[in-house]
Amino acid sequence: MNVPEVVEYARGLKHVAFADEGKWSCSVDYLAKIKEAIKEHNLNRVVIASCTPRTHEPLFKQTVKEAGLNPYLLEFVSIREQDSWVHMGEPERATQKAKDLIKMGVAKAIFLEEGEEIRLPVQTDCLVIGGGVAGMSAALQIADQGFQTILVEREPKLGGLLNRVSTVSHDHGVMPAPEIVRVKATLVESHPNINVYTGTEIESLQGYIGNYKVKLKTNGKSSEEALDISTIIVATGMKELEPTGQYEYGSDSRVITQLELEELLRGMSENSELKVKDVVMINCVNSKNETRGCCNIGCSISVKNALALKKLHPDLQIHILYRDLSMVKEEHFHLDEAKGAGIKFIRFPDDRYPQLVKEDGRFVIRVYDILLGKELEIPSDMLVLTTAFKGNETVGQIKGYLKVSANSDGFFQEAHVKLGPVDFPSAGISLSGCAKSPKNFKESCEEGMAAAMRVSIPMKKGYIEAEGIVADIDLTDCSKCSLCYKNCPFSAIQLDENKQPSVIKALCKGCGLCAADCPKECITIVHYSDEQLLAQVEAALEESPEKKILGFVCHWCALGGVDMAGVSRLQYPSNARLIRVMCSARVPIKLIERAFELGAAGVLVVGCEFPTCHYITGNYACEARMNRAKKKLSKKGVDPDKLWVDWCSAADGPKFANIMRDMVKQLNLG
């Protein structure tokens, strides 16, 4: 592009007092020049037109701050990744696009207002819900740092599911579960910083990080006073999903589950009599099907328990029938040992589960062996079912208290599988162990410690700090519909006794879902207000709107895809003028309608790929709203096919480039 021409154009824009060109704008020397210009020209807004804001915006924010300007009075425009790198063969169009992008940046900057980071004090009291190995590991980790910890367990004693288990895999061997529970429980109960409440449930819980009020009920008796809690760890564990009605489970005592076998093994020794000769285990009962995936630990449990039986009774004939053997690396020694001990493994097809038949009162298991390519009949005195798991009964109650999500099996959903694997969306609440998904002993302990680490951070700092991009509610026109309260993914909006909403700014992430959905339009997002976004829309479409596609891209994934296309030098048509929003859920229907009123050839909204979203439910909210937008456009006589909605990961530059090519082709803009 012709950079000097772009700079000269910028100088001529209304309200622009100074414009300059810098080859290395992020260098120390040029950053110093920016600070000098702010002071010399008494600038009260700054627009940086260079690379992507995803990498360098914090650097320039700090620069303007050092010059005495509020960092939220900076607007960043990407003319490299969005323009010069992707339109290398058409410099004139790239130059014109750069002018438009800068004009859009200036239009928004005019309406920028000062923002500030918000701090919320956090004390040093943590509540751990659940006294299994994950909960005990978390409690010990927190208490060892000097924080007061309250551990609540609804059962009469600590240990959770381990109280029913015989052994656990550990360091290429097994350890007796009762001994593990005894050692862990002793450490917890004797720790000076841990208060243990067994036989106790949560009666009420309300508040937010640094300001939770919790009431307990112990052995049916309610506590008189509420406890002050700053952070919470949910470690409520899981339970075995009983396969009632399958393979005659529940009607024939010879059919048991792996957990019931564990209980038998707890009471067995080498001298124990076992009145069976043939044991068959069927894996993946109620798992790896249309309703749920792999249970993660079933294969390891079946192999471990088969070995335990074989060691106690070497003459036993044991068959393990499986679809796939999914075991973590550290537990593969069990598999080799089992094969060496004579335990037989038979793989059956996904669509052809083993069948149970009775011959003269004895079990016969019919199974198709994939390796042999034929059906086998295996006699059995005991049939052990490796079943799926589900969350504990308390999940519904805890979910309601904390405003968090759980799947259909009652397992809590983390904020993000990669970026927040032990976090809930709301700050100050973590989850661990089998409350999230089935896990082995080692994983549960590690996740308990990870959750402890996460909640320890704000307790050590003494506060949490939120960026200034937050929601602000003007109550003048508020209808008290509570939509913002219901839809906020982060529980950052609270209602008073009159249903009047207010924003807990330290919890708000600035996604904008509430603002876009507010029927009275009385919610503003600092730095992404309707006024600012509308100014960008109108600036983008001021000239030749019939040749332009107006795009809204989320900062986290979609813009990452745009940037990746740029870094990869993927060439696509120059028709798009993109507006950055923090989340696709921020895009209100009225901006789309306005774009078409101004004559836009098309509108594109791109959010995060499903099922992930930086703001948990943002892309789902966007999808629902865009469906409504299409219907409204159709009623207004606008072709709804001119509104494109798509989803893009941060690494998917080729996909974004293809979206642009396809859209230009369909709209006949070539």
Where are these regions (language model features)?
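Residues forming the flavin
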Residues: M1-K548, V553-V567, Q571-I589, L598-T617, ...
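C-terminal functional segments of enzyme domains
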Residues: F345-F348, C648-G670
